[in-house]
Regions:
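N-terminal subdomain of nucleotide-sugar transferases
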Residues: 1-68, 114, 264-267
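Conserved catalytic-core segment of nucleotide-activated headgroup transferases in glycan assembly
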Residues: 26, 214-289, 295-300, 307
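Acceptor-binding helix/loop patch of EC 2.4 sugar-transfer enzymes
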Residues: 74-96, 142-182
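Donor nucleotide-sugar binding/catalytic pocket of nucleotide-sugar-dependent glycosyltransferases
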Residues: 141, 151, 174, 182, ...
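Acidic donor-binding loop of glycosyltransferase active sites
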Residues: 189, 307-321, 332-334
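Short hydrophobic beta-strand element within catalytic cores of glycosyltransferases
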Residues: 325-328, 335-339
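Conserved acidic donor-binding segment of nucleotide-sugar-dependent glycosyltransferases
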Residues: 354-361, 369-375
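A charged, aromatic-enriched C-terminal amphipathic alpha-helix characteristic of glycosyltransferases
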Residues: 375-406
């Protein structure tokens, strides 16, 4: 499938090894898939230090022909992300820096130097200004690679805002992002979406429907073969995983689960444990004080937690995109209980490959039922693993990438 004459310049504001979050995992898997079908050149808008140093370079070098760093990469991390998180959640998630035309000009210089056929904007949700610059100043084909509908992510937090001032900020930020998504979809040669749910949104704004293509969230199944031996756990355990910051979807999900659902589960299964992992979880939930809730924060590897959990819970009430954690749970052979929104965009059948529950009683009942029935739990887990292997591994992404490239050449 690889086209040795095709050159892609892949540029991203978010790159890290090992992956710290869903976005960085998506970038990693995109690089792996695109390297299988093209000669890939990597342009990082973050410094060597910020992507993980020599360890990261050693990991990525097998996938790219060459790597370039922007002249300002030592000082830059995405500012746009902070604009939204500070307005909505009252917290800057990343150090504030701004991209400049100097970086954009350098990207074009490298595109010319490598004779790239396509410029691929990884984590395109942060790359709209770059998209505009490239289309105004060059004739390159540009792929805007999104991982969600960010305006939905913002606006879905509206029902959970406590104050009118906060609601006003959410509406303003959401509408601003919506406007960006509209002109961005029209301007990009291709806008990618992680699911048909997101794709149907972007297709509203384009003249030709093939300007929007699916480029799914997937996982590299080989990664999940490591350390697969399960420990002998005396008591059942639940796993809650994600990226946390004050007011984040994960904070809301964790607090709803801990305050409302957890007591009902403990009543039926008194010795159960809940493990919470992910960047910021230890800080955001630092006041949670219960021996059976173990909050680990950011961990070096999620694999021991996934492989040894009895069950994964995804109690999200607002978000956008598709959840890597569900795919990871499937790869590791554990069942999942999720809200409808948490499983959005994934082609999974309720009560067959996943358990869907949206109320406190439903969620607690689904968790208890799976924990008390090994046969049911194993069936759900096996079916989920089968779907992940069929539809959500790197081969799927390679095929989708090939179709995107074919439409542009």
């Amino acid at each position: 499938m690889k086209n040795n004459f095709l050159k892609i310049l892949y540029t991203t504001p978010i790159l890290h090894y090992p992956p710290e979050s869903g976005p960085s995992l998506r970038v990693e898997n995109s690089i792996k898939a695109l390297s299988k079908i093209s000669n890939l050149y990597l342009y990082s808008r973050s410094s060597i230090y910020n992507i993980g140093g020599k360890r990261a370079l050693d990991f990525y070098k097998i996938y790219y022909k060459n790597v370039y760093f922007s002249p300002l990469s030592s000082f830059y991390l995405p500012n746009v992300f902070n604009v939204f998180t500070e307005k909505i959640f009252r917290k800057k998630i990343l150090p504030v820096r701004t991209e400049s035309e100097e970086i954009y000009r350098d990207i074009l210089r490298i595109a010319d130097k490598t004779r790239a056929n396509i410029i691929w904007l990884g984590y395109g949700n942060l790359s709209y200004p770059l998209l505009k610059y490239l289309k105004q100043n060059s004739s390159y084909k540009v792929v805007l690679d999104t991982d969600s509908v960010w305006s939905r992510f913002v606006l879905r937090g509206l029902p959970f805002a406590q104050k009118e001032k906060e609601k006003t900020k959410i509406i303003k930020a959401g509408k601003a992002k919506e406007a960006e998504e509209i002109w961005g979809a029209k301007l990009a040669d291709v806008t990618t979406a992680v699911s048909e749910v997101d794709a149907s949104y972007y297709r509203q704004f384009v003249r030709k429907k093939d300007q929007v293509k699916i480029f799914s969230n997937v996982i590299d199944l080989e990664t999940y073969q490591l350390g697969s031996k399960k420990e002998n756990n005396r008591y059942p355990s639940l796993l809650l995983s994600g990226t946390f910051w004050p007011g984040s979807p994960m904070e809301d999900a964790a607090r709803w689960f801990i305050d409302k659902v957890w007591p009902e589960i403990k009543h039926k299964i008194p010795k159960i444990k809940l493990y919470i992992i992910g960047k910021g979880s230890d800080k955001v939930l630092n006041l949670v004080d219960e021996k059976q809730i173990i909050i680990k924060g950011q961990v070096e590897s999620v694999l021991p937690y996934f492989f040894n959990a009895s069950l994964m819970v995804v109690p999200l009430r607002f978000e956008s995109g598709t959840r890597f954690k569900i795919l990871e749970a499937g790869a590791c052979g554990i069942p999942v209980v999720s809200t409808t929104l948490g499983a959005e965009g994934l082609k999974l059948k309720n009560n067959i490959e996943i358990e869907i529950a949206d109320t406190v009683r439903q969620f607690a009942s689904s968790v208890i039922s799976l924990l008390l029935s090994k046969e049911k739990s194993q069936t759900i887990a096996t079916n989920l693993k089968k779907i992940v292997r069929q539809n959500y591994d790197l081969r799927t992404l390679e095929h989708q990438g090939y179709e995107i490239i074919k439409s542009l050449l």
